């Protein structure tokens, strides 16, 4: 546990609550002190849905600490069972309430005797895993619970559907453009004459989970959630899965070829060929292929970018930048430290350096050092970009409200390639745009940013030096500012004047 004002991945209970609130008619009870119960507010603010967040906080207060939690937790489970009549109630502690070392499984067993709903305790170690790992584990736990229950009751139907079909696993609440990606994946599968059997957890019912084995294969678009479930289904029900993220032209084609392989394995006498579809989509439907060869995109050749995000999006965007658009990636990184090996394997050869960290100050210092033309990252990298005057395109969670768009903005599939190409191209400052604005005035009244990125700096710019900095063209201003600050630190100078600026320039050119 650590104190931070920014976290890329939240605590474990947030992942569990995201999965529980994605299902229909599932209620989550969070055993937590006041302050840990911000999930309701966060989801209500960000997710553009009409329904209330199905999460109740069973507050740990002084009375609970004096008398124990059992009575309160069991009462809350029974009350929600009567009020909401959910199919499933998920009980989860938080990392704070886990300190009490209570036997919550005993509370669940006791509540199960009087509740009409199924009741389970989220099987997650709150000290060892983060939000994404907990979400992956909770989804697998819920799927396992209902499939084993159906197997015991003899109601499990494992006969495959007549036509090729797939389960889409890993679309869930507060995900980055997840709803749009889901629509695009459905459209992609429909074009391939593959029916969608189930989408979980988003909008799915736990009662329908016993139908999962009827699909021919599982599609897992994101590594962060769904992979454990797909591995469980493969091991216990022999269901193959495709885990190639269909992001960008090359990887979308590769994903479709994997789907073709699994479909042909099940119907060897009636093989399908998706190559004509891939060819048509790449040449005529996706605009990204010809755009990447156009004169507009060639303006970006040799420009340097930095990428940072979750493992799935950061790896995919890095490959798109380097392989499909000819942009040099100075550094690519992820905050998914648990997936470091896979990430390194995916981006090897596509970037100059790799960074795996969940400390935003390390990311900020790396960006300041590399001085890229554009950043592709999370909400935090957008803030860093604003402070350094570097444009930023948001490509990964965690994000704020502007990345839960009302319009159709998928990142996956062939329509996703168009969105990504737009995002990449529009993120770079074009030509002399900034400089012309400064020369001719216009309506751009922003002041020069003189704050340094590092939080421990004590450098200040006086008024005259700020005016002097303002005269420098925007496309080199950031570099000159950083070089001047570096010179000042080396010489133990705390206030930067015009004289210091010229001294720094002379020292650099010497």
UniProtKB/Swiss-Prot annotation:
CDD domains: Pchlide_reductase_B. The keyword Plastid applies. One of its GO terms (biological process) is photosynthesis, dark reaction. It catalyses: chlorophyllide a + oxidized 2[4Fe-4S]-[ferredoxin] + 2 ADP + 2 phosphate = protochlorophyllide a + reduced 2[4Fe-4S]-[ferredoxin] + 2 ATP + 2 H2O. It is found in: Plastid, Chloroplast. Gene3D superfamilies: 1.20.89.20, Nitrogenase molybdenum iron protein domain, Proto-chlorophyllide reductase 57 kD subunit B. Pathway: Porphyrin-containing compound metabolism; chlorophyll biosynthesis (light-independent). Its EC number is 1.3.7.7. The active site is at residue 296. The keyword Oxidoreductase applies. [4Fe-4S] cluster binds at residue 36. One of its GO terms (molecular function) is metal ion binding. InterPro entries: ChlB/BchB/BchZ, LI-POR_suB-like_C, Nase/OxRdtase_comp1, P-CP_red_C, Protochl_reductB, Protochlorophyllide_Rdtase. Keywords: 4Fe-4S, ATP-binding, Chlorophyll biosynthesis, Chloroplast, Iron, Iron-sulfur, Metal-binding, Nucleotide-binding, Oxidoreductase, Photosynthesis, Plastid. Its cofactor is [4Fe-4S] cluster. Substrate binds at residues 431-432. GO terms for cellular component: chloroplast. Coiled coil: none annotated. Belongs to the ChlB/BchB/BchZ family. Component of the dark-operative protochlorophyllide reductase (DPOR) that uses Mg-ATP and reduced ferredoxin to reduce ring D of protochlorophyllide (Pchlide) to form chlorophyllide a (Chlide). This reaction is light-independent. The NB-protein (ChlN-ChlB) is the catalytic component of the complex. Protochlorophyllide reductase is composed of three subunits; ChlL, ChlN and ChlB. Forms a heterotetramer of two ChlB and two ChlN subunits. NCBIfam families: DPOR_BchB. This is Light-independent protochlorophyllide reductase subunit B. It comes from Physcomitrium patens (Spreading-leaved earth moss). The lineage of its organism: Eukaryota, Viridiplantae, Streptophyta, Embryophyta, Bryophyta. The gene is chlB.
């Amino acid at each position: 546990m650590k104190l931070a004002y920014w976290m890329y991945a939240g605590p474990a209970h947030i992942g569990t609550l995201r999965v529980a609130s994605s299902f229909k008619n599932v209620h989550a009870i969070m055993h937590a002190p006041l302050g840990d119960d911000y999930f309701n507010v966060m989801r209500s603010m960000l997710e553009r849905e009409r329904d209330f967040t199905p999460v109740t906080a069973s507050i740990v207060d002084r009375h609970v600490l004096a008398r124990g939690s059992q009575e309160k937790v069991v009462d809350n489970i029974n009350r929600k069972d009567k009020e909401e009549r959910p199919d499933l109630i998920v009980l989860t502690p938080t990392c704070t309430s886990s300190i009490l070392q209570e036997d919550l499984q005993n509370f669940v067993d006791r509540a199960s005797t009087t509740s009409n709903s199924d009741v389970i305790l989220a099987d997650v170690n709150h000290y060892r895993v983060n939000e994404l790992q907990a979400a992956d584990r909770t989804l697998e736990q819920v799927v396992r619970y209902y499939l084993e229950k159906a197997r015991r009751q003899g109601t499990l139907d494992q006969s495959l559907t007549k036509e090729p079909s797939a389960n889409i696993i890993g679309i869930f609440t507060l995900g980055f453009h997840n709803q749009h990606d889901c629509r695009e994946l459905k459209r992609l599968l429909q074009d391939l004459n593959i029916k969608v059997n189930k989408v979980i957890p988003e909008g799915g019912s736990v009662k329908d989970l016993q139908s999962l084995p009827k699909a021919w294969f599982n599609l897992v678009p994101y590594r962060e959630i769904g992979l454990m479930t797909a591995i469980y289904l493969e091991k216990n029900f022999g269901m193959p899965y495709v885990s190639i993220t269909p992001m960008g032209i090359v990887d979308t084609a590769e994903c479709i070829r994997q789907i073709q392989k699994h479909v042909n394995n099940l119907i060897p006498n009636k093989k399908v060929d998706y190559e004509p579809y891939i060819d048509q989509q790449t040449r005529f439907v996706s605009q990204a292929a010809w755009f990447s060869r156009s004169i507009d995109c060639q303006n970006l050749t040799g420009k340097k970018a930095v990428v940072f995000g979750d493992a799935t999006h950061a790896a995919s965007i890095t490959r798109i930048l380097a392989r499909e658009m000819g942009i040099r990636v100075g550094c690519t990184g992820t905050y998914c430290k648990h997936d470091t090996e896979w990430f390194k394997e995916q981006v090897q050869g596509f970037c100059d350096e790799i960074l795996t960290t969940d400390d935003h100050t390390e990311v900020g210092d790396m960006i300041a050092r590399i001085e890229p033309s554009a950043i592709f990252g999370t909400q935090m990298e957008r803030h860093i970009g604003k402070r350094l005057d570097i444009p930023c395109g948001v490509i990964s969670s965690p994000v704020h409200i502007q990345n839960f768009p009302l319009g159709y903005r998928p990142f996956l599939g062939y329509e996703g390639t168009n969105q990504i190409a737009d995002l990449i191209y529009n993120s770079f400052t074009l030509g002399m745009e900034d400089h012309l604005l400064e020369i001719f005035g216009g309506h751009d009244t922003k002041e020069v940013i003189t704050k340094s990125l590092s939080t421990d700096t004590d450098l200040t710019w006086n008024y005259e030096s700020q005016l002097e900095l303002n005269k420098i063209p925007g496309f080199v201003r950031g570099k000159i500012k950083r070089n001047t600050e570096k010179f000042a630190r080396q010489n133990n100078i705390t206030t930067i004047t015009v004289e210091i600026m010229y001294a720094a320039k002379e020292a650099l050119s010497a």
